């Protein structure tokens, strides 16, 4: 279980600019955690892995961040919370089949408050942060 996390030290104002940077560190993490940042500002993370969907159905994903973030599910951007901004949450609902689905979350912190929360809810459970047992590095 877990995700591949790439950590960057950079001054950017959009997740689109992360791809132009070089990661300082790449490691396996249990979930979407940014506490391993070595700085209070001017950093970014890219989390890559798979999410295990327990049953066919509609799921709502939530992405709360300060500053910008995006969520990409099965190679489609489903949540765009990008840009330099204070704490904000965006969400998207999508129909998914049971099984593993590719998930990527890109996040950057320019300055000020720091937050990244990745949550979901389904017919069988209320909104909650995505727990490590649902996250996998590869299939």
Give the label of every model feature segment:
Residues 1-60, 64-139:
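Extracellular/secretory pathway-exposed regions associated with glycan biology
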């Amino acid at each position: 279980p877990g995700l591949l996390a790439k950590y960057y030290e950079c001054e950017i104002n959009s997740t689109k600019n992360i791809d132009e940077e070089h990661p300082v560190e790449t490691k396996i993490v249990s979930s979407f955690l940014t506490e391993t940042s070595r700085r209070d500002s001017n950093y970014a993370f890219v989390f890559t892995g798979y999410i295990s969907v327990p049953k066919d159905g509609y799921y709502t994903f939530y992405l709360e961040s300060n500053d910008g973030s995006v969520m990409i599910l099965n190679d489609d951007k489903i949540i765009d919370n990008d840009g330099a901004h204070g704490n904000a949450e965006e969400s998207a609902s999508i129909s998914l089949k049971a099984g593993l689905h590719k998930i990527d979350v890109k996040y950057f912190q320019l300055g000020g408050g720091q937050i990244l929360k990745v949550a979901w809810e389904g017919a069988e459970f209320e909104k909650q942060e995505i727990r490590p047992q649902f996250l996998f590095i590869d299939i």
